[in-house]
Amino acid sequence: MNTATGFIVLLVLATVIGCISADFQGGFEPYEGEDAERIFRRSPTCIPTGQPCPYNENCCSQSCTYKANENGNQVKGCD
């Protein structure tokens, strides 16, 4: 076994031992309760006035109407 192979074997062995010890210490336990909700909760956002809107409920004003854009095309935009 040459030096490079020995180094790789030691690196893999250290990684496996590290993962096993982290598991015994509870390092891989999932978040529970409010912590998980706080991490994955999305903040409510709305589309400001003048921006294109796909749905009425996404506009801050709750109103989405057809308007002419800079090219003269009719697009839905938040009021």
From Swiss-Prot:
Tissue expression notes: Expressed by the venom gland.
GO CC terms: extracellular region
Cellular location(s): Secreted
Propeptide regions on this chain: 23-40
Cysteine pairings via disulfide bonds: C46-C60, C53-C64, C59-C78
Leader peptide range in chain numbering: 1-22
UniProt site (Critical for insecticidal activity): P52, N69
Chief subcellular location: secreted
GO biological process, any: defense response
Keyword vocabulary terms for this entry: Calcium channel impairing toxin, Cleavage on pair of basic residues, Disulfide bond, Ion channel impairing toxin, Knottin, Secreted, Signal, Toxin, Voltage-gated calcium channel impairing toxin
Entry GO MF terms: calcium channel inhibitor activity; toxin activity
Domain characteristics, as noted in the entry: The presence of a 'disulfide through disulfide knot' structurally defines this protein as a knottin.
Function: Inhibits insect, but not mammalian, voltage-gated calcium channels (Cav).
Family: Belongs to the neurotoxin 08 (Shiva) family. 01 (omega toxin) subfamily.
Listed name of the protein: Omega-hexatoxin-Hi1e
